[in-house]
Amino acid sequence: MHYLIFMDVDGVINSVSFYETVKSITENPLDPEAIKRVKRLVELSEQHSNSVRIILTSSWRYGWNRDPKFRDVGGKIIDTGLAMYGLRIYDKTGVSETRDRPGEVLEYLRKYPYHVDGFVILDDANFFWEKYRLSEWWVKTDAKVDGFKESMIEPALHMLQNPPWWLRLINIGKKKHT
């Protein structure tokens, strides 16, 4: 089994309530408790999958690159913040001219070289996910309080384990991840 977690940053692993506790602009802007909840989702997913990968969909992706030499400060903050909890970004979605996040997720799924058994989208904003038939795999996080909450872990896991029927069509001809 091979799962993808499409993850935003603002409103998922940070929130307004967290920012209110930050005392200095030099402090890490990522909420350790929200990151631990994402870690819990990954751990539960790994019980059913041999591979769980986090794909960055956030505007923070502009500063993140697969090659660490090309990451800016924001990219390094994400890497460091997640690495403290044993997590890492595997990749990022592309950026369309229209900044169409649902379309970017679908394009990523289409171009991804391996068979995907399930995915979930963690995002605080509604980018018209329903228009792309993605709303059933979207966990609406809370940008104001706590981002990705404990109560969202089980629904996210359920979404990973129950992919859309059309994912089979996207997977045709793709190799299984080992």
Kindly give the residue locations of the regions a language model identified.
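Active-site neighborhood of HAD-like aspartate-dependent phosphohydrolases
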Residues: 1-50
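C-terminal cap/substrate-recognition subdomain and adjoining C-terminal extension
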Residues: 71-178
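Short amphipathic alpha-helical segments
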Residues: 18-19, 49-50, 67-68, 132-134
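Structural motif
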Residues: 4, 53, 118-120
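Acidic-and-aromatic substrate-binding clefts and catalytic sites of carbohydrate-active enzymes
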Residues: 32, 62-66, 96-99
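Short catalytic/ligand-binding loop motif for oxyanion handling, primarily in non-cytosolic enzymes
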Residues: 14-16, 62-67, 127-131, 148
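Substrate-recognition element of Asp-dependent hydrolases with the DxDx(T/V) motif
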Residues: 49-74
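Short His-Asn-centered micro-motif
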Residues: 7, 56-60, 122-124
